[in-house]
Each structure stands twice: as C-alpha cells, then as structure tokens.
A protein has these predicted regions:
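Short, surface-exposed "cap/lid" segments of acyl-processing enzymes
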Residues: 4-65
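Catalytic nucleophile-loop/oxyanion-hole region of alpha/beta-hydrolase
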Residues: 65-91, 96
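Gly/Ala-rich beta-loop-alpha elbow adjacent to hydrolase catalytic centers
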Residues: 99-103, 107
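Active-site nucleophile loop of the alpha/beta-hydrolase fold
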Residues: 122-132
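Short beta-strand/loop motif that positions the catalytic acidic residue
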Residues: 190, 196-198, 202
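Conserved alpha/beta-hydrolase "acid-adjacent" motif
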Residues: 203-209
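Catalytic histidine neighborhood in serine/cysteine hydrolases
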Residues: 211, 215-233
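Catalytic active-site module of serine/aspartate enzymes centered on a nucleophile-bearing elbow/loop
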Residues: 228-255
Length: 255
C-alpha cells in the first residue's frame, strides 16, 4: 500500500454540490488513520449521484508522507471535521456524518459537541479504543521508534487499495490513543441516530470497538448491520453496495 499512483484528485479534499430534492442534505465522510479520502470517494460519488451534497476532507497528517502523521496533534483531526461540518451546515438543512475506522471515533467526538448540526451518524468498522497493554506505553515507544509495519489495506477484494501509508507512525498512534480515550468519554452525551456497519472478519479492529459504541452511546435510535464478505476497509470491499444503499435509506428516512 502506498499513495503513489492514486487517481488524480483522490488524495485531496473533495466536495460536490447536491441536486434535486436532496440538494439541501449534506453528508460528511471521514476516512481512517493512515488511510486517505480515496477510501470514501466511491461512497461519496454514490451519494452525490442520489442528489446529496458531499464533503470528503483530508484529515491532517494524511495523503502526503507517513512522517507527517508523526507531527500532528489529535486536536487538528477534530478541528478539520468540525470545520467541514460547519461549512456544510451553511447550505444544508440536514447533515449526516459517515466515519470509517478512526474516522468513526473522529466523527463521534465532533458530533458530541454539535448535535444541533448532526442529524445522523453512520459508522463503518469504527474505532473507539485500542486494546492491549503495550498501547499504554506508546508515547514512550515513540521516542525510540518512528514507525511500524502498515495495518492498512485490509480488503478482501483482490487488487483494491485505499491509497494510504505503507507504515504506521508511532507518534501518530500515541495521539490516536489519547484522542480515542476522549471520544469514548463523550459517547453517553450523543443522542443522535446511529447506523453501524461491522465486518465479522475484520483483521484490523477487535469487535469490542463496535460493542463499546453500541453499549455506551446515548442514542436510543441505533442499528447494527453485519457485513459477511468484507474486511476492515469495507467501503471498498465486496459489501460496499450494502453499506451504500442502507446508508442512503438511513439518510432518506431522517431527512
């Protein structure tokens, strides 16, 4: 996996205006850690073809060099999503957030502070915690080790890539660990409707992430759909159509 060779424009911020009766409904799609906007572009194109206004931002530290992810503070991830949310709300009557992996934790953190602006949250294999004893010492480890092997491109469908980094930046992981702990504490505050997709064969995240979110989130309107034929980056995998269509119905019913 590497960002070289990505389709032109797929590693940049992407925005498209809506059309027809859905033109005033916006969808903000947030990619995962070490991933890129490319992992959300087909999803965004599908929704835009249905008339929805879409925004797929580059989360700071991504879509450039993996070393850049060792230089950012977690707050910049939240700020980027918040900025895009506020911009969408200027022209949209309803706004929904879609988060993949860490993009899920990122979306939840921001949504907790902006429930007046968010009408629904769609999560695809979301990350809300990192289990294991070693992660507690990641800040110390990051002082002597800059990176580890990549955890990206966990995709069952052959020949598909998310155009992310080919290394796992350790200082970036330390920031991610801090961020997810804060995001988890906010879960009980979130009353927004939630649709969560979970791959039963996910090699990147433990199922406890899904269980924690569904158990601890404050929303009474929450749905879970299991994906039987996809790995972690399910938005690019065999079950993508299931995600796209069910997300469309979720948005349609609430707008």
């Amino acid at each position: 996996m590497a960002i070289e060779g990505a389709p032109q424009g797929w590693l940049s911020d992407y925005r498209a205006k809506g059309s027809g009766s859905n033109a005033d409904v916006g969808v903000l799609l947030v990619h995962g850690f070490t991933g890129s906007p490319a992992s959300m572009r087909p999803f965004a194109h599908f929704l835009n073809e249905k008339g929805y206004q879409v925004s797929v931002p580059v989360i700071p530290g991504h879509a450039s060099r993996w070393q850049d992810l060792n230089k950012v503070h977690w707050s910049s991830w939240a700020q980027k999503v918040e900025q895009e949310l506020v911009e969408l709300k200027k022209t949209c009557r309803k706004v929904f957030i879609v988060g993949l992996s860490m993009g899920g934790g990122n979306s939840l953190y921001v949504a907790a502070d902006h429930q007046d602006k968010v009408d629904g949250i769609i999560l695809v294999n979301p990350m809300i915690h990192i289990p294991g004893l070693q992660i507690k010492f990641v800040s110390i480890i990051s002082k002597v080790q800059k990176s580890r092997a990549s955890v990206g491109d966990d995709i069952k469908k052959p020949g598909v890539t998310e155009w992310g980094y080919d290394a796992l930046p350790i200082k970036g992981v330390a920031q991610l660990y801090k961020y997810l702990k804060l995001a988890r504490k906010r879960l009980p505050r979130i009353k927004t409707p939630v649709l969560l997709f979970h791959s039963v064969d996910d090699h990147t995240l433990d199922v406890s992430n899904t269980e924690i979110i569904l158990d601890e989130i404050g929303s009474s309107d929450k749905q879970r759909i299991e994906l039987l034929n996809s790995y972690h980056v399910a938005t690019l995998d065999y079950d993508a159509d299931i995600i796209f269509e069910n997300a469309r119905l979720f948005i349609q019913e609430r707008s």
